Curated annotation (Swiss-Prot):
One of its GO terms (biological process) is xenobiotic detoxification by transmembrane export across the plasma membrane. Its main location: membrane. Guanidinium ion exporter. Couples guanidinium export to the proton motive force, exchanging one guanidinium ion for two protons. Overexpression leads to resistance to a subset of toxic quaternary ammonium compounds such as cetylpyridinium, cetyldimethylethyl ammonium and cetrimide cations. Homodimer. The subunits assemble with antiparallel topology. Keywords: Cell inner membrane, Cell membrane, Ion transport, Membrane, Transmembrane, Transmembrane helix, Transport. Residues 50-57, 103-105 are periplasmic. It is a multi-pass membrane protein. It comes from the Bacteria. This is Guanidinium exporter. SUPFAM superfamilies: Multidrug resistance efflux transporter EmrE (SSF103481).
């Protein structure tokens, strides 16, 4: 259950990371409320997952999901670069997340 909660927390990190772009420095109300809410819920779920997962593993997986998710969102929705080096780097992050999951009992 902790891993599911951690994945949800990571996905919410993507929401708030991408949401920051749409807040325009927190000058737009709706995107700002959505972004701050996603931040709070993401952090709360991360803390909950850390009750039974190693801190380093949980934090690395959370940030990894956020980084990969934000980059993929940027590529797919925002027209950001999808060059081979960037995609290979994202794949390495995903492999690292899988490795951390497999090495945690």
């Amino acid at each position: 259950m902790s891993w599911i909660i951690l994945v949800i927390a990571g996905l919410l990190e993507v929401v708030w990371a991408v949401g920051l772009k749409y807040t325009h420095g927190f000058s737009r109300l709706t995107p700002s409320v959505i972004t701050v809410t996603a931040m709070i819920v993401s952090m709360a779920l991360l803390a909950w997952a850390m009750k039974s997962l190693p801190v380093g593993t949980a934090y690395a997986v959370w940030t990894g999901i956020g980084a990969v998710g934000a980059a993929i969102t940027g590529i797919v929705l925002l027209g950001e670069s999808a060059n081979p080096m960037r995609l290979a780097s994202l794949a390495l992050i995903v492999l690292g997340i899988i490795g951390l999951k497999l090495s945690t009992h």
